Each structure stands twice: as structure tokens, then as C-alpha cells.
Amino acid sequence: MDKFTTLEGVAAPLKIINVDTDMIIPKQYLKTIKRTGLGKGLFSEQRYNDDGSENPDFILNKPAYRGAKILVAGDNFGCGSSREHAPWALLDFGIRCVISTSFGDIFYNNCFKNGVLPIRVEQADLDRLFDDAERGSNATVTIDLPNQEIRGPDGGTVKFEIDPFRKHCLINGLDDIGLTLEKKASIDSYEAKAKTERAWA
């Protein structure tokens, strides 16, 4: 998992509440267990018309937001069914941070496990971030995870809270496997000691 320290880029404003995981990545893309290639399915029912052509009105199809690294979204983002493909799709598209007032619990947890930072903010702060994001490629937003703050294009800051353990994992690029490997020396020491003390086992 790639480390997450500071992220600077365009933020796309998605002013829709209750965006569920089926909207993020429709069910037809769930057949794969690969984490790559799912960016094409991200919001596919909104990004594409029935004939497969792009919907020019959808935010991520607009020139200013095609390379967005941050998504500013309405309340209750990622609600609905459990599917780890949702953060996979965001990450494969290039989005490493989602900002909202609240998230679906399972989606929220899955984001941390896959290197995507979900940030909860108050509604007033979200409204300010929406205003910043609507300026498109003329304005960039910076996510400073070590200092736990969002910096807008005009220098304004929004502080955010994050669990210290989850912060540690993101900064150091540790997923579940990485966490286990981090303890490898202790595990090896325990196993060597156990073999000596219980040679009969």
C-alpha cells in the first residue's frame, strides 16, 4: 500500500447525498478480485450514457476534474452494501481522499485498509470546500495528514480528526499484511522460544 503523507491536487465537488456503494461501483464490476482496472467502473452509470458515450454533465467527465485526486461529497457517502471494490475503484481512478460530513461505516473502514483517506468535517466546512472545489483546475486543495488539516487554495485551513492507529498505518503504507510483517521479528522470536521451551510439541 502506498504511503499517504501530503496530497495536493484538484478536488471534485460531488453534491449528492446518500451515494451508496452500488453507485460508486455497480454490481457488474464485482466479479473480479483484482484491485486494478476498476477505475473505468467508478460511477459508470453516471459517467456514461446508455450508448457508452460519456455524459458531459457528470463532474468527473468535465475537463477540470478528470485528474481529480480528492472528492468532496455529500452526506452519508459510501452507504449501502459492503463491497471493498468501492475504495479500489476510487483508488484506481486516482482519488486518494474523500471528504464528507459522514460515511457508511463499512465503506469508511474499507477505505483505510486500502490507502484511501476518508475525512469527516462539519457541514459549514464542507460548504467552504465545495466552494473551493467548484473553482476547478484553477484551485488546488492540500491534504496534510501528519498535521491533520485541509488547506484550501486561499490558505484557509480545516482541521480534522483521525484515529491515531489508522493515521500511523496510512503514513507508513501499512495494510493488514504490512502490519503483520511489521511484527515479523517479534513473531520469529516467539516461535523460536516456543520451539525451545516445548520441543516435545
From Swiss-Prot:
From the UniProt record, give the pathway where this protein acts.
Amino-acid biosynthesis; L-leucine biosynthesis; L-leucine from 3-methyl-2-oxobutanoate: step 2/4
One Pfam family from the record: Aconitase_C
The answer, when asked if Lyase is one of the entry's keywords, is yes
Question: Listed GO molecular functions?
Answer: 3-isopropylmalate dehydratase activity
Q: What class of enzyme is it?
A: lyase
Q: Which Gene3D superfamilies match?
A: Aconitase, domain 4
Source species, domain of life: Bacteria
Has keyword Amino-acid biosynthesis? yes
One GO cellular component term, please give it: 3-isopropylmalate dehydratase complex
This enzyme's EC code(s): 4.2.1.33
UniProt entry keywords in alphabetical sequence: Amino-acid biosynthesis, Branched-chain amino acid biosynthesis, Leucine biosynthesis, Lyase
Q: Known InterPro entries for this protein? A: 3-IsopropMal_deHydase_ssu, Aconitase/3IPM_dehydase_swvl, AconitaseA/IPMdHydase_ssu_swvl, IPMI_Swivel, LeuD
GO BP annotations of the record are:
L-leucine biosynthetic process
Reactions catalysed, semicolon-separated, are: (2R,3S)-3-isopropylmalate = (2S)-2-isopropylmalate
PANTHER family per record = 3-ISOPROPYLMALATE DEHYDRATASE SMALL SUBUNIT (PTHR43345:SF5), 3-ISOPROPYLMALATE DEHYDRATASE SMALL SUBUNIT 2-RELATED-RELATED (PTHR43345)
Q: Which family does it belong to?
A: Belongs to the LeuD family. LeuD type 1 subfamily.
Self-association state and partner proteins as the record states: Heterodimer of LeuC and LeuD.
Q: What does this protein do?
A: Catalyzes the isomerization between 2-isopropylmalate and 3-isopropylmalate, via the formation of 2-isopropylmaleate.
Tell me what this protein is called.
3-isopropylmalate dehydratase small subunit
Say which species the protein is native to: Rhodopseudomonas palustris (strain BisA53)
Q: What is the gene name?
A: leuD
